[in-house]
Amino acid sequence: IDSMHTLCGKFQYDKIFRQELLNLITINETYFMRELNQLNSAMQYANTLSISGNTVKILCAPCSSGEEVYSLGILAKTIGIDKYRLKITGIDINSDMIQKCKEGIYNERSVKNIRQSQKEIYFKKVNSDYKIKQELMPMIEFKTINIFNDSLFALGQFDIILSRNMMIYFDENYRLLTIERFAKILKPYGRIYFGSADLVPYCDLYSKIIDISGTYYEKV
């Protein structure tokens, strides 16, 4: 590639090149039970919804390498949510990360916040790593999706969305676009949790709720 013009053209028309470049430049930094208060809040709400007999749908966007999704699965099992009443979808623009999610193998650093008793229940030791026991998890799926692509809307409607520490990389216009797009796939009175570092723009589609376990946004 000998010029920026050539690069832009190849990015636009070559799907394989575009995905490889996105995989290279996206940032992935996460671990199990990160910002645990928010995860607990989300799962307590999911538990309340599941009691009615409905299947609760949760979206993690972006899901990075899967630690957040599996953390929710562990918490759901811990508080007794029926695994068949909960479906968690993880999406990410990085296809390499989605493959890692599906493999479910993590190093010691990723599981540093997992209690030893939980490691013994939910993980299988593979050499120096830990492999999640997916048979103990609720319904989980991972997909390579760009939130600014309309394939997002094919996922259906969700009760809870977690999108933590993604918007810190966006400007004001893209932050607003992000929460407007999420509103289209969030059920009425559904909750969305952002990261503590995210700058969330005002949007009349949500009410900001400040709770003892942390802040979330409720669709109005």
Across the structure, where does each feature detected by a protein language model lie?
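Short helix-capping segments at alpha-helix termini
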Residues: T78-Y84
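Short hydrophobic/aromatic beta-strand or adjacent loop that forms the aromatic wall/cage
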Residues: D211-Y216
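Conserved AdoMet
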Residues: I1-L59
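A structural alpha-helix within SAM-dependent methyltransferase catalytic domains
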Residues: M43-N47, Y70-G73, K77, A183
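Extended basic-aromatic, gly/pro-enriched interface segments that bind polyanionic ligands
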Residues: Y84-L162, M166-F170, Y174, L199-P201, ...
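A short glycine-rich, Lys/Arg-flanked "PGG" loop and its adjoining helix->strand segment in the class I
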Residues: L176-P188
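Conserved beta-strand signature within the Rossmann-like core of class I S-adenosyl-L-methionine
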Residues: P188-S196
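Conserved class I S-adenosyl-L-methionine
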Residues: N54-G66, S71, T89
